[in-house]
């Protein structure tokens, strides 16, 4: 039976890629120290989709939530389950998840980031998940209260209440994301301190980032999503085609040429919402790793919106993207040809070797 289970449930875009990369790279060291990461990163993601019963989940899931929970319960030490998609679970689904891990001591871990950085990264994540709405439309919907999913699934206060109310206050943990310029290991040490991971146990490589797209690259992807129509409606096919061949191989490699963000016309609104969030979290009984002041936006400067790009800028980026995809296709074709030649050479060597052996045996007769 597991002693403690740490459920790191979100929020998205709070450094989870870096934290999870450290965890999975050091899973053997963690296991030797009595800390289990059940399944794999993909298995935990599949289990999340099963728990939430999302429409884009794979139909033939091997790793259901019940299977992951059983794996966790069967470990005699501590267990870590980390997937930022868990934060989007409903209250009923969250309760099911916690109950499935009993009688272990379940801890809930939620990370929070300032809203000035959260808003553009959330829109971009939606674009990279096949959405097609404009940045301005997204911001307007959030501001008018017409997109409650943002507050439920991408901010710490509501997520922490939905999950944290299921466990005692001493088992609710809020990690604040350090501001830009902080040492890259600060976030990791905050997580490690909560989960009881000894200092120095895990090797920290250069932080694995989930780089943002520039304004033009994001706009190209948004228009591609619209043009796809009903093709690749499920997440896995979309990831294997669009995410792999367009986003990861080309768009993310271009660098963030033109950064974008919330305009200064909404700065006062963002600051007000941040103060409300800080007040609510200060009043909620939980353990804070970091400082709630880090949720207060700083360095709010004017930036352009992808909506402001003219068609010429988007066309130039699209053409450059097509050229890069052709180069990528050529590289893949070259590797495939080389692989074919290597396999063919091995087959010929085996055939020639077999023929020579048979000839030698025939000669001895």
What is each residue range found by the language model?
Residues 1-365:
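Anion-recognition interface
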């Amino acid at each position: 039976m597991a002693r403690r289970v740490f459920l790191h449930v979100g929020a998205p875009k709070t450094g989870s890629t870096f934290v999870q990369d450290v965890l999975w790279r050091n899973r053997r060291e963690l296991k030797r120290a009595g800390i289990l990461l059940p399944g794999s990163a993909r298995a935990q993601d599949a289990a999340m989709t099963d728990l939430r019963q999302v429409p884009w989940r794979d139909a033939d899931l091997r790793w259901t939530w019940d299977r992951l929970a059983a794996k966790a319960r069967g470990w005699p030490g501590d267990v870590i389950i980390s997937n930022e998609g868990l934060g989007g679970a409903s209250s009923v689904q969250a309760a099911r998840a916690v109950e499935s891990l009993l009688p272990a001591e379940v801890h809930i871990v939620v990370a929070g980031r300032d809203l000035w950085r959260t808003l553009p990264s959330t829109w971009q994540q939606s674009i990279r998940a096949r959405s097609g709405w404009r940045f301005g439309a997204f911001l307007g919907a959030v501001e008018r209260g017409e997109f409650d999913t943002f507050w439920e699934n991408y901010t710490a206060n509501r997520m922490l209440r939905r999950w944290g109310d299921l466990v005692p206050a001493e088992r609710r943990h809020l990690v604040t994301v350090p501001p830009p310029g902080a040492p890259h290991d600060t976030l990791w040490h905050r997580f490690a301190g909560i989960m009881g991971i000894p200092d120095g146990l895990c090797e920290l490589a250069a932080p694995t980032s989930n780089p943002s797209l520039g304004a033009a690259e994001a706009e190209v992807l948004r228009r591609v999503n619209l043009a796809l129509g009903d093709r690749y409606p499920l997440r896995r096919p979309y990831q294997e085609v669009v995410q792999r061949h367009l986003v990861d191989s080309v768009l993310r490699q271009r660098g963030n040429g033109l950064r974008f963000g919330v305009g200064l016309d909404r700065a006062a609104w963002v600051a007000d919402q941040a103060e409300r969030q800080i007040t609510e979290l200060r009043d909620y009984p939980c353990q804070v790793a970091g400082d709630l002041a880090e949720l207060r936006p700083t360095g709010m400067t004017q930036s352009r919106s992808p909506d402001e790009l003219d068609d010429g800028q988007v066309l130039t980026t699209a053409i450059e993207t097509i050229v890069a995809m052709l180069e990528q296709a050529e590289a893949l074709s070259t590797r495939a040809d080389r692989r074919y030649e290597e396999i063919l050479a091995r087959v010929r060597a085996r055939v020639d070797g077999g023929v020579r052996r048979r000839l030698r045996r025939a000669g001895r007769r």
